[in-house]
């Protein structure tokens, strides 16, 4: 779907009025380009596609950066996100003595950490408008019947790498409560490459708008 359709669908389905997009062009938009993550990896083809569309955005007037001292600790974010995700996914599973249930105190402790992380992200967005990252570290990979994510692996730049850590890319936005949009910006060996466009809390329409502009640049 195109960005206009995404924006319309959001307006039609949102239970509250969403703020309008802050950006109608890329001129002056402050974009943090994040091609590395301390908890996972991305193939060189993915990172090259990310840099290429970022360079085109800069030519259109965007202001690029590649780091910020205000960024939260992404390794800790991934650790706590995996904890919460595992708990959520196990709620309907049979009891497992190897993985005892978490207590209410510990769960609220995780919620406190999540809320603190969301505040840290908001401070980071004082200095940037948009963050772009890989969605996943590779293009589409061969199907596997292995049900255990921890036993799966990927080939990244010719070397075996763990599959399960790839959720660190999308986990940043999910755990931090930020809107993100996946958008195609290139291809490698005939397979599409997407990037993730992350915006501040409640700026869903801004994420959609910038994603659409980046997609148009990549297509051009």
Mark where each language-model region is.
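A short helix-breaking turn/cap at a secondary-structure junction
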Residues: 1-48, 217-220
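Conserved beta-strand termini and adjacent loop/short-helix elements that scaffold enzyme active sites
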Residues: 34, 67-70, 183
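Short glycine-/acidic-enriched loop or helix-start segments at secondary-structure transitions
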Residues: 42-43, 76, 141-144
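Acyltransferase
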Residues: 44-69, 107-128
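Charged, often glycine-rich, active-site loop that binds/positions anionic groups
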Residues: 76-91
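Short glycine/proline- and acidic residue-enriched helix-loop micro-motifs
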Residues: 96-108
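Glycine-rich, small-residue loops and helix-cap segments
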Residues: 106-220
